[in-house]
Amino acid sequence: MASSSDSEDDSFMAVDQEETVLEGTMDQDEEPHPVLEAEETRHNRSMSELPEEVLEYILSFLSPYQEHKTAALVCKQWYRLIKGVAHQCYHGFMKAVQEGNIQWESRTYPYPGTPITQRFSHSACYYDANQSMYVFGGCTQSSCNAAFNDLWRLDLNSKEWIRPLASGSYPSPKAGATLVVYKDLLVLFGGWTRPSPYPLHQPERFFDEIHTYSPSKNWWNCIVTTHGPPPMAGHSSCVIDDKMIVFGGSLGSRQMSNDVWVLDLEQWAWSKPNISGPSPHPRGGQSQIVIDDATILILGGCGGPNALFKDAWLLHMHSGPWAWQPLKVENEEHGAPELWCHPACRVGQCVVVFSQAPSGRAPLSPSLNSRPSPISATPPALVPETREYRSQSPVRSMDEAPCVNGRWGTLRPRAQRQTPSGSREGSLSPARGDGSPILNGGSLSPGTAAVGGSSLDSPVQAISPSTPSAPEGYDLKIGLSLAPRRGSLPDQKDLRLGSIDLNWDLKPASSSNPMDGMDNRTVGGSMRHPPEQTNGVHTPPHVASALAGAVSPGALRRSLEAIKAMSSKGPSASAALSPPLGSSPGSPGSQSLSSGETVPIPRPGPAQGDGHSLPPIARRLGHHPPQSLNVGKPLYQSMNCKPMQMYVLDIKDTKEKGRVKWKVFNSSSVVGPPETSLHTVVQGRGELIIFGGLMDKKQNVKYYPKTNALYFVRAKR
């Protein structure tokens, strides 16, 4: 014990000595050292010591929604700077719109939250109290008899879709309604829905219901009124003070309206004002813009078949009788086409419309690639589905000519005739033993054309209704392989630049069994698969159709151009290609299979015959097509895709000079993603939000969500 106590005393003495040394060191450090103090001061600076210009520039990168609100609570200086940043954000965006100096941002899968269902003809508005965009109803392209009555909220701070499960009296499922903001309420009016499929021949149903939704209470309420407008859809509405002004709309049975109705939002009573002078033609689908508290602008609309309007009218709401005033539209040739299905939104002294680009052949916006995705730059790899695809897979409608490499067209079938060998010319595929490459999942059908001096006499086949179409998520390339591609979305049918999709005008066909020679054939001839398991795609052993007619030379020329486009990408791409049409066994332009069959090999080179070459955009892009933000796929599907462009209407001289003027832009930044119609455009804080819409089937674009796309338009930095 004594030894232990001695050791403890020694340890205490050592600790005391260490403390004494430390105290001496601290005493020495307390002596002033000007150099050390300056160094310490330089490394301990805070953001408050930064120049306000630098701090303001840093704060400008914050989101104009919740992040601005949070930053303003830091201190008085930040509160003052945030107010200036918000002012610059708003006015900078207005200036960018006037000059066409904008940038596009796309939100594609995967993004946070539950994905909203694809839809068009929906209603949307911006609610600033919770910094969200609300979307109600609409209908979907996949089910023509279905409409929605769901309500969705897009949190513009987190870009997350949220579905409020509200209580109260829900509206009916409908599309074509209007949704406006009044104080702390969202007011929903009108709309229509398709009838149920049974019994047949029922008319569409139109609504005159008024519902209000309270975001704070999460409650729907039905408002009962009397002596109001007839049931309508496709009308326009806006709120001025405590009045909701409604104009036009479709009444059903091909009837349009040009009446003006006013709803008192305090008393919930309808009235119809007296209006003097000429009035606009009855219409629906127009845009209604508030100029000031006593003036409303009506733009475009549709009055029925072959009655599309591009005019502009002012409604003066004076104390006396209201009056209509037609406006002169300048630079109408540079204006937005089809104003009836592309809504307008006011930004400062301009009205913005997103519609089809004038030429319809302009490349998609390069500004979509200007910044990485804010959600996920490298999305997780998606595993392709492994289920079997049977022959009843949906086949492209015969009346829809595909968009192939920038051109529209179909291959017309060739007439049959019996050959001495007993095989048919013009049948879906050759007799057993002929080597015929598969083109987009089908084989090649006979035809002749001159390519570089050689004749074309290879079998050519198109996809018939009895032949399985390409399963979703598969890359349709020229060759015998239909392997699924990693990272492709399950609901995509990928068509890269150079791939071909053939349509035929089918005629009554005779029974044959042309696919027997192709069921168990692979490129190397070393693998054998049963018909239902070949490359994961079911190939029916019996195809009971034979085509009559001749192959279009123009379509064959386009097919050859597609082969050259793919072969120009390098040896790896050329190895997967089918050989050129018309080669015979043992010829220089053929490759022998292990089974003794021969298929031609493509010979890359300049375009021949008609002098066509690769499209200019393909030559300019070379081996590096533009990439989308998230999926990493080319932004365009073919050169004939219709991009969406921003059109700007100057309205500053509306009241004084009675005219509006379309601006002319030379910048490519106004050209954006593929065109959609019947979408919604909502103005947020320093940005425009475009959601949903109906995409043209003939655009053949596979890398964008078809009708639930979400785009943001902001000022370019």
Curated annotation (Swiss-Prot):
Pfam families: F-box-like (PF12937), Kelch_3 (PF13415), Kelch_KLHDC2_KLHL20_DRC7 (PF24681)
Gene Ontology terms, MF aspect: ubiquitin-like ligase-substrate adaptor activity
Residues where Phosphoserine is found: S365, S373, S552
Repeat region (Kelch), residues: 132-184, 186-242, 244-293, 295-342
Composition skew (Acidic residues), residue ranges: 1-30
Modification type Phosphothreonine: residues: T378
Domain spans labelled F-box: 44-93
GO cellular component: a single term: SCF ubiquitin ligase complex
Region (Disordered): 1-34, 361-474, 570-631
CDD domains registered for this protein in UniProt: F-box_FBXO42
Function in brief: Substrate-recognition component of some SCF (SKP1-CUL1-F-box protein)-type E3 ubiquitin ligase complex. Specifically recognizes p53/TP53, promoting its ubiquitination and degradation.
Protein name: F-box only protein 42
Lineage: Eukaryota, Metazoa, Chordata, Craniata, Vertebrata
Gene (name only): FBXO42
